Amino acid sequence: MAREKFQTLTEPMFYILLCLRRERCGADIAAEVRTLTQERVCIGPGTLYNLLDSFLQAEMIRETKAEGRRRSYLITSKGQDALDEEYRRLLRLAEDYRTCKEGLQ
């Protein structure tokens, strides 16, 4: 059975949505992701703008302003729900790891 789109978020998806809890443009999103992850996750412009377009189509984010080529975005309630669900999924993953690791000791 195929999974629903955005049922599981990749790291770039997760961090983009996380950053969009505050209004930001693409360049600011990329910079914030690098800062937040201490350079561990770097999102290139191709990936960033493709994901922003997908999130817009899925109504997970909305465009808040456009000044020339610079566009700003903000997460929607649908995007926040997806972000919250991914956070819970990651917590379950970590709990499964801990349970298995403790069982092997």
Which positions does each model-derived feature cover?
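Short, hydrophobic-biased segments on the C-terminal half of alpha helices
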Residues: 49-54
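Helical "lid/switch" subdomain of P-loop NTPase nucleotide-binding domains
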Residues: 47-48, 79
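N-terminal helix-turn-helix DNA-binding core of bacterial DNA-binding proteins
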Residues: 3-47
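Basic, amphipathic "hinge/linker" alpha-helix immediately C-terminal to the N-terminal HTH DNA-binding motif
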Residues: 68-86
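Amphipathic alpha-helical dimerization/coiled-coil segments
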Residues: 84-105
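A positively charged, amphipathic N-terminal helix/segment that binds anionic biomolecules
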Residues: 1-2, 73
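Beta-hairpin "wing" of winged helix-turn-helix
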Residues: 56-68, 74
